[in-house]
């Protein structure tokens, strides 16, 4: 880390010279942040090293804009040179490779979890149309109210309903009307006889003489 001592001194001079001119700019914040964390890493702070490696890609974006826009190209080139040196000394290449491997590993794990979740879902079994047509007809037994057990062979729902309606229609007992009419006729005959008897009782001897 002592290799970056010269870069720290250079950054201190840049900050001291331009702090009043660029203090409100966004890219200037990255310059001050880089200087502060470099000092912390030289003192042996490992967290500052990780923070610098995370900061460098964003700082690179802002420092390249200084060159692209033509505002401060010379200052932008100096800052990019410092970034490149810090990135190389602190192991930025290994850090980036580690991040990429972690991303790839997390993507693989996510795919495994998705496949496992799909396997746990019960989607049923696929039945082909030929298998349905090749199944044997179903035999059902129906017990009508007035007949004995009768077996019907069903090949389709429509034929089953048609056969059921026909069996129920044929098995139903005919309606007898004669019993009711006989009872009514007997009742009417008995009432007529009673009326005749009552009429005979009401006749006296004179009626019998004159007929």
Curated annotation (Swiss-Prot):
Membrane topology term: Single-pass membrane protein
Keyword rRNA processing carried by entry: yes
Annotated GO biological process: endonucleolytic cleavage in ITS1 to separate SSU-rRNA from 5.8S rRNA and LSU-rRNA from tricistronic rRNA transcript (SSU-rRNA, 5.8S rRNA, LSU-rRNA); maturation of 5.8S rRNA from tricistronic rRNA transcript (SSU-rRNA, 5.8S rRNA, LSU-rRNA); nuclear-transcribed mRNA catabolic process, RNase MRP-dependent; tRNA processing
Location of the protein in the cell: Membrane; Nucleus, Nucleolus
Protein name: Ribonuclease MRP protein subunit rmp1
Keyword entries, A-Z: Membrane, Nucleus, Phosphoprotein, rRNA processing, Transmembrane, Transmembrane helix
Annotated source species: Schizosaccharomyces pombe (strain 972 / ATCC 24843)
TM stretches of this protein: 73-93
GO MF annotations, alphabetized: rRNA primary transcript binding
Record keyword Phosphoprotein present: yes
CDD domains: RMP1_RBD
Subunit note: Component of RNase MRP complex which consists of an RNA moiety and at least 10 protein subunits.
Biased composition, class Basic residues, residue ranges: 181-201
Function: Functions as part of ribonuclease MRP (RNase MRP), which is involved in rRNA processing in mitochondria.
Subcellular location, principal: membrane
List of residues that carry Phosphoserine: 156
Domain of life: Eukaryota
Gene Ontology CC annotations of this record: membrane; nucleolus; nucleus; ribonuclease MRP complex
Ranges where the record places region Disordered: 178-211
């Amino acid at each position: 880390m002592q290799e970056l001592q010269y870069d720290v001194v250079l950054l201190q001079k840049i900050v001291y010279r331009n702090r009043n001119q660029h203090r409100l700019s966004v890219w200037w914040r990255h310059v001050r942040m880089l200087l502060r964390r470099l000092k912390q890493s030289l003192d042996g702070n490992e967290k500052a090293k990780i923070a610098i490696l995370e900061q460098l890609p964003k700082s690179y974006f802002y420092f390249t804009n200084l060159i692209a826009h033509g505002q401060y190209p010379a200052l932008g080139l100096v800052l990019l040179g410092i970034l490149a040196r810090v990135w190389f000394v602190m192991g930025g290449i290994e850090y980036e490779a580690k991040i990429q491997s972690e991303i790839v590993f997390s993507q693989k794990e996510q795919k495994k979890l998705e496949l496992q979740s799909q396997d746990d879902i019960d989607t049923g079994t696929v039945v082909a149309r030929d298998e349905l047509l090749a199944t044997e007809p179903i035999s059902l037994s129906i017990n009508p109210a007035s007949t004995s057990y009768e077996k019907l062979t069903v090949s389709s729902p429509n034929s089953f309903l048609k056969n059921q309606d026909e069996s129920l229609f044929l098995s139903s007992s005919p309606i007898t009307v004669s019993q009711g009419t006989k009872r009514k006729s007997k009742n009417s005959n008995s009432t007529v006889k009673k009326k005749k008897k009552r009429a005979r009782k009401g006749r006296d001897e004179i009626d019998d003489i004159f007929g």
